[in-house]
Swiss-Prot record:
Protein name: Fluoride-specific ion channel FluC
Binding annotation for Na(+): G76, T79
Name of the gene this protein is made from: fluC
An example Gene Ontology molecular-function term: metal ion binding
Activity regulation, short description: Na(+) is not transported, but it plays an essential structural role and its presence is essential for fluoride channel function.
Domain of life, source organism: Bacteria
GO biological process: cellular detoxification of fluoride
Species for this entry: Albidiferax ferrireducens (strain ATCC BAA-621 / DSM 15236 / T118) (Rhodoferax ferrireducens)
Subcellular location: Cell inner membrane
Protein task: Fluoride-specific ion channel. Important for reducing fluoride concentration in the cell, thus reducing its toxicity.
Keywords on record: Cell inner membrane, Cell membrane, Ion channel, Ion transport, Membrane, Metal-binding, Sodium, Transmembrane, Transmembrane helix, Transport
A GO cellular-component term linked to this record: plasma membrane
Mode of membrane association: Multi-pass membrane protein
Length: 130
């Protein structure tokens, strides 16, 4: 039974994350030189995983199914390393080196900074509410 609950949590989370990424692409990608939908998905995912990391550390007794639903499922469906990689390789293949490497930098450093910001935000809010 526990296995089925875990599978269901991952499936629901992944479906919702993928739908959110799809909507971001529809909203932000049409005609954009830089695929902003993919960037937004990865940056939002970076921030949200930071929040999740801090919350799960602060609440160690929280049912692990939440980690599966939120991190493995939702954030796994929302963020996309493969699309980011294909977009950057496409830019480099078109000899748009500045755009390609700039995009790679935005994804990498932006996600790292927003993950740290998410951890700091959640840590502050947890400390503020205790």
């Amino acid at each position: 039974m526990r296995l089925m609950i875990s599978v269901l949590a991952i499936c629901i989370g992944a479906s919702l994350g993928a739908l959110a990424r799809w909507r971001l692409g529809l909203w932000l990608n049409p005609g954009a030189v830089l695929p902003l939908g993919t960037l937004a998905a990865n940056l939002i995912g970076g921030y949200l995983i930071g929040i999740c990391v801090a919350v799960f550390q602060a609440l160690p007794n929280l049912d692990p199914v939440w980690r599966l639903a939120l991190i493995t499922g939702f954030l796994g469906g929302l963020t996309t390393f493969s699309s980011f990689s294909a977009e950057v390789v496409g830019m480099l293949g078109q000899q748009r080196y500045a755009l390609g490497f700039g995009t790679a930098g935005l994804h990498l450093f932006g996600s790292l900074l927003l993950t740290l910001a998410g951890i700091k935000t959640a840590t502050f809010l947890i400390a503020f509410n205790t």
